[in-house]
Amino acid sequence: MSARITPQTPALQALRMRLHAQHQPVVLMRTDCHVCRAEGLAPRSQVLIIAGDRTVQALLYQIDSDLLKTGQIALSEAAWDALDIHEGDLVQVRHPPLLESLSAVRARIHGHRLQTTELQAIVRDVVDGRYTDVALSAFLTATAVLPLDMQETIHLTRAMVDVGDHLQWQAPIVVDKHCVGGLPGNRTTPLVVAIAAANGLVMPKTSSRAITSPAGTADTMETLAPVDLDLDTLRKVVEKEGGCVAWGGAMHLSPADDIFVRIERELDIDTQGQLIASVLSKKIAAGATHIVIDIPVGPTAKVRSRETAEHLAHHLSEVAASFGLVLRCLFTDGNQPVGRGIGPALEARDVLAVLRNEADAPQDLCDRVALVAGAVLELGGVAKEGDGIRLAHETISSGRAWEKFQRICAAQGGFREPPQALYVEPLLATTSGRAVHIDNRKLSRLAKLAGAPESPAAGIQLQVRLGDEVTRGQSLMFLHAQTSGEMAYALAYVHDIGDIVKIEP
């Protein structure tokens, strides 16, 4: 989108209002502003703001007060940063160009399949900031009601790759992994990266923040080391240490994905086609050639049946093959959380316990890591078929994984210990018996109500596993919160929902 300030359109003086609106550009104008009247600009309409050769499309709000003087316009942080202006600079306001790709969204709402050019236009306009949250919600909802077919998924993946930057590596094999999610804990990625890099593989891992879970890999890793790496820094870290764990949103790799994720989080949806396009577009952009996908299967996991898992694996493999990727899917146990911690800092403590070979390190996390890392080592050609799990365990027990992890953290900006919550409350068993069911979804919801992932120290520390014998009054879990209000909110939820851990005599 190109435009320049012209003498024909009156200019307004820019005022920085320091409003944070989740990356959404917002502007405030007076209701009696001559530009609003001349251009016919209505409240909550989209407007184009021009400053020199820079532009940004923003949501307009109008005010009837002296907060703004005549001839002024106030901009949110997102709009201010996009224009790169200074206090008092002159800007112009116009109607934005017609959003032609929106017709394809309307067609998709009515059940029409989208072609390559239509999806490319939608993704380009999304990245250019031309889609409102309402329009984004319409597109994502349309692809949830009538799921993307194979060709649409391939086209969307390609479109998401094409609008971003790409990393290229000298190594012929570049490995990566992804977990489909829906399972609390299961923080294998930092460990798998350390194991892979310690064995000579290249693994530039870019991870996301939480969408609907209490913690994403980037949230957890951020409690241990900086993750906001730019492309140059990421490249230097990987060239030096062989691997990294960085937040993908800090770079321009598949930038549409970060925008889609923000809306998906608010809608609390995560559809198969979008999931595949999200995962593979980021892997392709990061330069991966060989990928392991962990698909936990369980009644309260994201994937609830083996049939659904096989369907997802088939579609992942088909889309991956169309881009020349080598992909292996693992079906893993999704009946209960992996590790004890649920929430960024608590999951990080589990990671450290395994890396440091601590006596009380969660064995299930160690075993899950060995399974996933073993597949990565075999796929990457540094372990023979069937020997990957043994090599992964040896890399941990020998201390090589811990040494490599510390070096990666140092290269990313320095290692730090994860924070501790200010408030901790036990949740006690109300009866004696055996733990026969753990509701993953209720656990995740509870951890989020306690403040995770926004409060990194918040979450849950689980004390029981399926099959454990429990006595009345025993701690089933510890609830961690950073504020008394969040703790009270979470405890009220526990009171309302009944058993999270089902105990039978």
UniProtKB/Swiss-Prot annotation:
HAMAP family, sorted: Thymid_phosp_2
GO BP term, pick one: pyrimidine nucleobase metabolic process
UniProt entry keywords in alphabetical sequence: Glycosyltransferase, Transferase
Pfam families: Glycos_trans_3N, Glycos_transf_3, PYNP_C
UniProt-listed Enzyme Commission number(s): 2.4.2.4
PROSITE patterns reported for this sequence: THYMID_PHOSPHORYLASE
Molecular function in Gene Ontology: 1,4-alpha-oligoglucan phosphorylase activity; thymidine phosphorylase activity
Source organism, top-level taxon: Bacteria
Name recorded for this polypeptide: Putative thymidine phosphorylase
InterPro entries: Glycosyl_Trfase_fam3 (IPR000312), Glycosyl_Trfase_fam3_N_dom (IPR017459), Glycosyl_Trfase_fam3_N_dom_sf (IPR036320), Nuc_phospho_transferase (IPR035902), PYNP-like_C_sf (IPR036566), PYNP_C (IPR013102), Pyrmidine_PPase_CS (IPR017872), Thym_Pase_Put (IPR028579)
Membership in a protein family: Belongs to the thymidine/pyrimidine-nucleoside phosphorylase family. Type 2 subfamily.
Entry's Gene Ontology cellular component terms: cytosol
Catalytic activity, reaction form: thymidine + phosphate = 2-deoxy-alpha-D-ribose 1-phosphate + thymine
Originating organism: Parvibaculum lavamentivorans (strain DS-1 / DSM 13023 / NCIMB 13966)
